[in-house]
Amino acid sequence: LTTADPITFRKTLNSLSNAGIENVAFEASSHGLFQRRLGDVKVKSAAFTSFSQDHLEYHQTMDGYLQAKLILFTENLIDGEEAVINSEIMFFDFIRSFLLEKNIPFCTVGNNGDVKIKRNKQSLEGQSICLEYKGKKYEFETNIIGSFQAINLLIAAKLVSNLGVEFDQIIEKLPEIEAVPGRLQRITSAENEYQVFVDYAHTPDALEKSLQELKKLKKKPGNLYVVFGCGGDRDTLKRPIMGKIASEIADKVIITDDNPRTEDPRKIRGQIAEAAVEAEEIADRKSAIIDTIAKLRKDDILLIAGKGHEDYQIIGKERFKFSDIEIARKAVQKV
């Protein structure tokens, strides 16, 4: 769970306050919002970073999922304070209309946002970004890879500016920010002939974005590989969708186990494979990662998707120590 119950959450905030912490950033999960786990906590600013098919085993419909997320802005955002919205996300027009109807001030971030990304030059080393905000142009470089991560970075910058920090000062500091572990994290170095990335992408939208970003960076005649699975006891509808996305964008698809939990992992892999043309199945995730890395050649790129920063794998009701990042690092060193 990413959002604690109201009492625990309040205790945590009180402890941070007693320790002299004046500003806190936290994730408000859709489950937590729907169950009112934030209680009466009010926030100075709130952001809507992404929205795509996920958690339908709980929310049942996309509309139910969206309405749960919007609770943050109607119940927990201080009246008159600003929401920050990713202008590139699914249902943006609906979200925009909703905020206008509720008289909630908002700022948009994206290719056509109030914080407007004018140019974004990508490389395996990071990206160079040119943006415009309130008539002023800014440029900076970051080692964080992926245009969608550039939007997240600028959303975070706008949230901080809403706390009273000058936007110019924030932009100056952005090059110092390191990539979040497991978010298009590069395992290899520039010296490697091939490249390996680990990403948390576990939804159709996230998988598509990560694969598209890496496809743009791939040099010919290299191939784009993807190793991924889907979690058990979770949304089953997304499995064939993710299989289709993987097979349409990647050159080589390897279906493996994610966190099967109490579901039959063969069934999960089969549902993904329904729409994944010519995909290979390797049930054991560690073997799938190691075997695929051993096959990589010059200019190939591998995306290991689904678990990202996680340091465990759930099989049945047991949690085992497991890290895509560590396994990939060791495999790269051995090749």
Predicted regions and their residues:
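Short glycine-rich, flexible loops that bind phosphorylated cofactors or substrates
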Residues: G32-L33, H55, F92, T262, ...
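ATP-dependent carboxylate-amine ligase
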Residues: I104, I155-G182, R186-V335
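Conserved helix/coil segment N-terminal to the catalytic DExD/H
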Residues: H31-G39
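Acidic, Mg2+-coordinating active-site environments of NTP-dependent enzymes
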Residues: A19-E22, V43-V196, A273-A275
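Inter-motif core of Ras-like GTPase G domains
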Residues: G39-F51, K219-V227
